[in-house]
């Protein structure tokens, strides 16, 4: 057994008919953990329903449907490997809660594959003012997905026919747009692909192929393998948002969550925000195994001394008492992008915020300024209202105690989705937090240390 490959999480984004599902399905099909038998079954069903041309998308739809019906699909199906990395596709659009998931991210994406349709008319629709290509690229950047690969898909379409001119035209347009969003276009590979034929997905196109005659760059899999290894924030102070709190007979209170930054280890004294309670960690476990320590990305349960289950809740944040412990907030300022709200938003609007594992109503107490959503330049001070498509700096006040952080310091605790009318109305990034000092309880074991 060699050294374990580094894990990289991918999110696949792009306009509705760009061929995302076919491309993703094909990737998983070729490199992933789907059993041959399951694929053959899907192929047969697709053919019977006259959907032969959708066979790879069909694979993905089947997986998604099962996932949405709550049948837990072996997550290995969504994994595939390259020479250097082990990739997991953590989400593909088409999921109802895609945007919310992308923000509160059960796991944060390290890399985005932006799939665009190359045929004339289709590409233009995706990149138009209200096209999803724009929306998704902007979201990915706003939410801190640092690396991107563009798949110029549907190159096999009869109106493209592997044309170098069309590829260059589309690439140039994408570069202009990605630069506006904030990416460095020179660092974003544009890979011509066909999700349907599989051309240039897994291996470089043959020189005799219409594409191979002019394209000499990497295939999609190589481009993925060439990505920079993600840096994990081990050296930051501990932040661990609680997903659940259990009471386990004979053991006691066990909070559960994912370490976002820093390390947690037995013997450490931790503080929970927003309540300010401090106690000692007795043990840390992952998959029923005791660990000497756990770091970013680890989903763990940890046992705490002399703390009742009633004292801790989902959405609380655990941190190291001696190293920048987390605190509740009185208010915070955030840059908010309104995605889809049917009316006008005024000061006093109070939707629900999903930030890390917290789900709390927050009031837009003050609209500070309206800004250009791409350049960040100020457009007007204290606007009367904001609406879909606007970006604004807003002062927010939570309806009950909550713990959030500035995005620059602790990214996973500094981005949020605004939910209203059962959809994601806006996304936000927290710029600054006004902390609230509380006299928290300290258990005996914490006081001793």
From Swiss-Prot:
Region (G2): 70-74
Region (G5): 194-196
GO molecular function: GTP binding; GTPase activity; translation elongation factor activity
Residues bearing the modification N6,N6-dimethyllysine: 55
Location in or out of the cell: Cytoplasm
Stretches for region G3: 91-94
Listed Pfam families: GTP-eEF1A_C (PF22594), GTP_EFTU (PF00009), GTP_EFTU_D2 (PF03144)
Listed PROSITE patterns: G_TR_1 (PS00301), G_TR_2 (PS51722)
UniProt keyword annotations, A-Z: Cytoplasm, Elongation factor, GTP-binding, Methylation, Nucleotide-binding, Protein biosynthesis
Chief place where the protein resides: cytoplasm
Residue positions, PTM N6-methyllysine: 265
Stated role: This protein promotes the GTP-dependent binding of aminoacyl-tRNA to the A-site of ribosomes during protein biosynthesis.
Descriptive protein name: Elongation factor 1-alpha
Source organism of the structure: Pyropia yezoensis
Lineage, broadest ranks: Eukaryota, Rhodophyta, Bangiophyceae, Bangiales, Bangiaceae
